[in-house]
Amino acid sequence: MEKELINNSQSNIYPFHMPGHKRRGSDIGAGLDPYAIDITEIDNFDNLHHAEGIIKEAQAEAAALYGAKRAYFLINGSTCGILAAVSAATKRGDKVLVARNCHKAVYHALYLRQLHPVFIYPEITRTGLQGQITEAQIRAAFDENPDIKAVVITSPTYDGVVSDVAAIASVAHEHGALLIVDEAHGAHFGFGGGFHQNAIALGADAVIVSLHKTLPAFTQTALLLLGGMREAAVEKFLGIYETSSPSYVLMTGIERCIHYVRDNKETAFAQLRSRLDRFYQKVSGLSHLNVVRKSDFSADEAYDFDESKIIIFTKEAMNGHTLLELLLKKYELQLEMAAGNYVLALASVMDTDEGFDRLADALIEIDSQLEKYKSDFEEFYDILKQEGVVHKFYLPVKMDTDIYQKLPAVMEMYDAYDADHQAVYAFKASGKVSGAFINIYPPGIPLVVPGEIMNDKLIDDVIKAVNSGLEVDGLDFDPDANMWKFVAVL
């Protein structure tokens, strides 16, 4: 592992992926040997779970930066903060309004606290991305379920789609419910550069931000920010979900990140915006690839769009996985992820002019090659295979706008998850109660959750996704029969 990590760090591969420090720790003053500062809770170094000294001061600095009532360091990642926030906002058996596109940690919290979810579904955009959650959806859900105790949404999404958090917070508070926002992909919000305001400033009661995703911080470092949620309840559940052996290396990394943003926000985010604008201008004339901008979304699809999420659609030419592989092997650009018809590159304040130029130049060259071979794309792929830069070709797969069905639930999710299960072949699964989550990555929205009844369309959609080269989680494969199996409740 160490050898591979060193090789990667010394290579010419440019990281358009998280973590947001982009392997440039020296640029934020991170020069210490991690072993030299790796300690436990010895005298004068405070205790994360009973912070009274230097950790308390560092957390107060984070709260001040984001405008929060309190901030808690998370060194188990945003997952820990999501579990704590949902648990603190509810009592066992409560009803919770949950955006279906929430992170799996939200579903784990529903399971652990035996909560009853009411799901709302984001619209799928014309291009196949998951869209926003709207104020109207939230209001309609409360009209049907006035006993909802908490609302949980993700904004921005992995792809950068932002919902109207202020309006959603207003509706939730009007009905006496708390609003929890998974803002893991928006830790850079609220600091200028034309990026959206952060959810705490917009009225959310608890907000989880993953510093490591978009800011210069170590992987698995995050913050739980409080607005209107009770501190005592949050601290109780952080004591359960967060490690009792917190890393001072990671906590110091959080503090360093907070100081960097505090001291450089006036220039760093404006510079990032300038670099993004220059990049988008360079690639605006592509014919066979399409780089998305905010103007590509209708008002119904997105309240706002985070342009530090660089989405490159492949149109008719190739699958996202093919483009991802081509960019890595030929151009030494490692992007964040690939989908059926697009790839995603993540930009941060630590990216350089060189990085953006390399990505723009690569896309322009690929687009020109696609134009050259537009009458016979197969010839182009044959050349790429001969060069060893692409090993497999998939056709583009656009996510159907109706793929996320509202399936009937006949069991509580936690009961179905704990029940005895059987693996059934695809052709026998329709009509059975799911015992597992089935997700297509990206975007990772569960097509079915435990307790819901599977139907023919679900099974057809899942098998289609597998055959198209997409990553599908929640299935079993029988190599002897060469068939997929679905997990069903006995």
Regions found by a protein language model. Give the residues of each.
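Conserved N-terminal alpha-helix of the aminotransferase class I/II PLP-enzyme fold
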Residues: Y35-G77
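Anaerobic metallocofactor- and corrinoid-dependent redox/one-carbon enzyme cores
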Residues: R24, I254, K432
